[in-house]
Amino acid sequence: MGDVKESKMQITPETPGRIPVLNPFESPSDYSNLHEQTLASPSVFKSTKLPTPGKFRWSIDQLAVINPVEIDPEDIHRQALYLSHSRIDKDVEDKRQKAIEEFFTKDVIVPSPWTDHEGKQLSQCHSSKCTNINSDSPVGKKLTIHSEKSDAACQTLLSLPVDFNLENILGDYFRADEFADQSPGNLSSSSLRRKLFLDGNGSISDSLPSASPGSPHSGVQTSLEMFYSIDLSPVKCRSPLQTPSSGQFSSSPIQASAKKYSLGSITSPSPISSPTFSPIEFQIGETPLSEQRKFTVHSPDASSGTNSNGITNPCIRSPYIDGCSPIKNWSPMRLQMYSGGTQYRTSVIQIPFTLETQGEDEEDKENIPSTDVSSPAMDAAGIHLRQFSNEASTHGTHLVVTAMSVTQNQSSASEKELALLQDVEREKDNNTVDMVDPIEIADETTWIKEPVDNGSLPMTDFVSGIAFSIENSHMCMSPLAESSVIPCESSNIQMDSGYNTQNCGSNIMDTVGAESYCKESDAQTCEVESKSQAFNMKQDHTTQRCWMKTASPFQCSSP
């Protein structure tokens, strides 16, 4: 019986010695890579036409019709039975079926052409949905979104029933106009706006134009940061009328009243100059002699850098001269803020010629027009330097600064004025330099500087009494800390110090050596070189006086 069964199981091919028929696409270990991706490119399924047709060949279907072959069904049955009994291996077949099932359930049958270009497609979508910012106004930013849709067909293995409600499930996640609700008002919550407009306390700065325009503090604060800004934004301010606050792009946070401008992060070699036109009208601050009549200087080219507390803005720069900048610092001594001592409110005269000082970095002076930086050790008097660059536009005005002096008397303002006019020598003994006699002019305006208690008011160390006789020249002077300004035009400057017209230097205090000289070139420009060696001052109450006389009154309006 065993031999009979064994003979039934053995099926020999029709021709003895013939190689058994095998599937050329299969191998004994093909189950190990059946689940892997076999298609190298989706272009396999594309039908390509050759440019030159080859030789004519009959197709298989045509040959079957032309030359039919008679196949015995018994031969087919025998060969099928042989193939089924010759290679029976349950383990290998199970592995193959498992690999085939894994291939059709987990992997993509045909790779989609969009699969290999995900990064490129994302970049295209990002560029098509970029925001266009209105460059005319950096504050009123308008968000414009170009919503573009691109359809692409790809293969999916997801099967859904006919009555499946896809909108209820994916409706919350699919929003075609999800960026349409972003308005300029909602931009305040973005991180970029917080970096630009938040001050050190974490709140929106008062310099934003969203503040009430009727309040004097917001209006003056807006004017303070108008004239100088360190622009770190790619948005360009085209019109100053549409840019009410260019200081909002300042790299340093703006504090409340006691301002300290930390400009340590400045990397730009040449700060961007501010616009030269301002529609805001400014008002001269009140002093003991100007309380009775208030002047409002209407000038499109000047501003008063004074806030409600009377603090003069240091970040004011003359926009007329760029390469040959005005005086940026009156002394090579650096700035330092002390809490103790008496603070002073002084004025500085700005003349359009270059100040060359030794011991100070020129690039630092160009980048930082006025700032509060630590300086070498000084006395507790709290001496500070502050530069004021204020400009206005008047024509045909003859300005004469008759005296600028420092005294240490404790009397009232009127007594000090009379004492200074009567006894000049006594004032010089008290560390006062008066180099010219007062010029009697019919219409004159006198300002007297008195010490104040505000700890943030600075004082300059270059207070030598120099008289400038200017006729049709471009000159900016600030007789008050509130900075009312009167410039002229042309460039003919005569400097009369009482001794000569070329060398105008004197000893200001006991240990101050100041050497100043003026050189006139063919282009009628002046260069002043100031060398300050030491500065020592007693801790006494000091009153600075400045008399300013005008040959013809400048135009002003009383509110």
Swiss-Prot record:
Coiled coil: none annotated. One of its GO terms (biological process) is cell division. Phosphorylated by AURKA. Keywords: Cell cycle, Cell division, Mitosis, Phosphoprotein. Interacts with AURKA. Belongs to the BORA family. Required for the activation of AURKA at the onset of mitosis. This is Protein aurora borealis.
